[in-house]
Amino acid sequence: MNRSLNSANFPHLFFAGRTRLTLRNNEKGTHIRLKVVQKKTRIEGKLVGTNRFYLYTSILNDGDTGWDFAATFFQDSKNYSLGKEHTQGSHIHKVVHFIQRALREPAVLDAMGAALFHEGKCCRCGMGLTHPASIMLGIGPDCIKSMPPSFITDLITVIA
């Protein structure tokens, strides 16, 4: 049950913490599912998010199985380190490079004919979304308070 998202919010949703997104190639009718999990570390007994985000990909529609570790992304630079199982020039490398381009300039998604969807769960905490406004944004009402101010600023420009 995928719900469409505005591609301008892609970087914010990608780095939200527990994101599951689908990128669909409208021209070819193909898709790839993305699962992004923030690396956390324990500081003084409390789990704190780090700058690293692990990207898993799945091209199958088989629920929670079939995820393959693709890369580690770094939020500040939007650079990535490709997973050890993948080589330069491989299909996954091309996908990860496209994601990097989309993180730096979200308009690339629309220009390349890619549509962005989420699975009905909050991209920050992973809980199911029920409120219509939350479903439209991909972030729950409590989690939106934790998003950076730029998320709200970008939303205003997108909605207006």
Where are these regions (language model features)?
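General detector of N-terminal leader/presequence modules that precede the first folded domain
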Residues: 1-51
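Interaction interfaces in information-processing and related assembly proteins
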Residues: 31-95
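Short, surface-exposed polybasic-aromatic patches that bind anionic ligands, especially phosphate groups
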Residues: 85-94, 104-114, 157
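Short, flexible, mixed-charge glycine/proline-rich loop motifs
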Residues: 108-119, 130-134
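Short cysteine-rich clusters marking metal-coordination/redox-active sites
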Residues: 122-125
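Short Cys/His-rich "knuckle" micro-motifs
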Residues: 130-136, 150-153
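Cysteine-rich micro-motifs
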Residues: 135-146
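Short metal-binding segments enriched for Cys and/or His
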Residues: 147-159
